[in-house]
Amino acid sequence: MTYYQRDLPHWHPEGKALFVTWRLNGSLPSGFRPLPGERSTGKAFLQMDRELDNGTIGPVWLRNPRIAQRVVDALLYGERELKLYELLAFVVMSNHVHVLLQPQVPLPKITRVLKGFTAREANQILGRTGKAFWKDESYDHWVRDDDELHRIIHYIERNPVAAGLVQRVEDWPWSSAREP
């Protein structure tokens, strides 16, 4: 098992699927912290995800269809061409991305490739230079068993419905629920 820590702890057991969330820089209040006692639980993630789904703080550049599609294209390219992972589920929301993948290389390499490419593409579309697009650290969780895997796929693909953006999962254009 690989372990490292920055602001968040990261455990990556070999052969396990990973649920990864990355968000736009500035998409949570600067003082945002999980409630005491919840940092190492799923409750902390849900608290963060609710804040992100509200989309009331910071940039929402992923609402731009060109940028959202670039992120989807990069995710698919990372799987099909670069062979970095097997992509199990994904959704691009207005200010964050959820991805469930089976890594073929270390997760830091995957996030560096995906976030680096999509940041350059998005900043070009937005006419921005020299500013961070993504928050530098990502949230990740290793999947314990098949039941959890299916719950996470359901969670990811229902995220646009839960956020009130669409009525049906297949109506959200930037999701694995739409992919053939």
PLM regions: where:
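Short catalytic/metal-binding and nucleic-acid-binding patches
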Residues: M1-P180
